């Protein structure tokens, strides 16, 4: 951990120097900041990175900038939910597939808002705003798709469940449950599955990124260094303890974590 009072250049050291230098050395790629003319912070020597296969920045940047992005799509759990609905007898009878329940492709989505559930309204002197789509009333889908129900709930009602509720609602879905459990473990069990990414705070977005990394870390090959900037922002003491245990789940297999606080 890199600790220090506010203004002591913790973020500069961890992000602008360490992360960007490792990114350049390991992948040979340059961050967007470098493309915009900002250089890697000055340092004398960088050693010990030879055994690393990747460096991952887990920051507080939004997971998406439109209502189309949400927690369940970000952690790649929506594929499982769509598969479950496509297997419902009524869906099979109507020849619906998993893509029918996607709001990112044509089929079952509302075409007026293109599955976003919201319409963007351009404002001249202020930031653009999003208002619920009048065609689908914010549901994202065409009415016939909502006829398909799994244990009494349609796809919209499932997306309105919190992570905690969804874990109880899908007790036999191991793959889906594992992804949702990781979100719960980072203290985000209160988030709704389909909650627009635009409503998430920076701290929530960062912890969601941690949850996704935890979900896929067991499948990944090689050693990673995770760089995090103040992940305990606005967390209560008990939540910090939980987060520390969760980060241990990343370190235990073969990865390392560097964080600033």
Predicted regions and their residues:
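Conserved phosphate-binding elements of NTP-dependent enzyme cores
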Residues: 1-261
């Amino acid at each position: 951990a890199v600790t220090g009072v506010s203004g002591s250049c913790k973020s500069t050291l961890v992000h602008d120097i360490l992360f960007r230098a490792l990114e350049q050395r390991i992948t040979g790629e340059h961050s967007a900041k470098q493309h915009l003319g900002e250089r890697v912070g000055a340092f004398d020597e960088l050693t010990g990175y030879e055994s690393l296969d990747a460096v991952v920045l887990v920051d507080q940047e939004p997971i998406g900038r439109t209502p189309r992005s949400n927690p369940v799509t970000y952690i790649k759990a929506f594929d499982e939910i769509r598969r479950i609905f496509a297997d419902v007898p009524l869906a099979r009878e109507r020849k619906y597939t998993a893509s029918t329940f996607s709001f990112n492709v044509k089929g079952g989505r509302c075409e007026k808002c293109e599955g976003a559930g919201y319409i963007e309204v351009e404002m001249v002197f202020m930031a653009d705003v999003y208002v619920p789509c009048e065609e689908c009333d914010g549901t994202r889908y065409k009415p016939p798709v909502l006829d398909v129900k799994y244990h009494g709930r349609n796809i919209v009602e499932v997306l309105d469940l919190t992570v905690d509720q969804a874990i109880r609602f899908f007790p036999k879905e191991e793959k889906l449950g594992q992804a949702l459990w990781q979100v719960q473990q980072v203290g985000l069990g209160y988030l709704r599955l389909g909650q627009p990414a635009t409503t998430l705070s920076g701290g929530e977005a960062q912890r969601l990124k941690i949850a996704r990394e935890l979900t896929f870390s067991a499948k990944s090959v090689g050693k990673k260094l995770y760089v995090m900037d103040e992940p305990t922002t606005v967390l209560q003491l008990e939540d910090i303890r939980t987060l520390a245990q969760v980060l241990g789940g990343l370190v235990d297999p073969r990865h390392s974590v560097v964080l600033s606080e």
